[in-house]
Amino acid sequence: MELERRIERATQQGARAIVVRAGDFFGAGARSSLFSQGLVTQGKPVAAVALPGDPGVGHQWAYLPDVARTMVALLARRAQLAPFARFHFAGHWDADGTRIAAAIRRVVARRTGIEPRVRRFPWWLLRIAAPFHETLRGLVEMRYLWREDVRLDNRQLLAVLGEEPHTPLEQAVEATLLGLGCLPARADAPAGAGA
């Protein structure tokens, strides 16, 4: 938030800025995300999906290609925006914290014939390692986002763009898993498992 305040102050001196807030990123190129380093392990077949949230707690996910299309659309309208324009990107709302894991399991089962198991995310392990690793410290600090619902309201974005780019969840998950090297190429999928 401090960075946003500094950016906003800069716009009072002639700079222009567009800020897009979004949920947890996922996508084929998002190699440093909780999706790619927590829910699944990039470069490995998905044997299990880790659930980082408390049961019943909703969470917001942002598919990077959709976020990119949103930013491009906002940039195309920058002349009509205030010098400091802040928007919320709704993305995919996982109302009970299990929807993304269920989508991963369905995609993997369809592509490989094997349904991954679900396990709890090992927050306890992160707390032990956090003092020695900056990224893990940051993750532990953001743990509250997995203990309480935090949902971004995209009405202002919709008022400007008319709609928010939105790839269907399973399509986005499949592209992400392929890009992370967690799924076999379509030709390697078992007979009858491909879409």
Per-segment meaning from a language model:
Residues 37-60, 115-150:
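Alpha-helical membrane-targeting segments
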Residues 70-139, 167-195:
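Mid/C-terminal beta-alpha module of Rossmann-like enzyme folds, strongest
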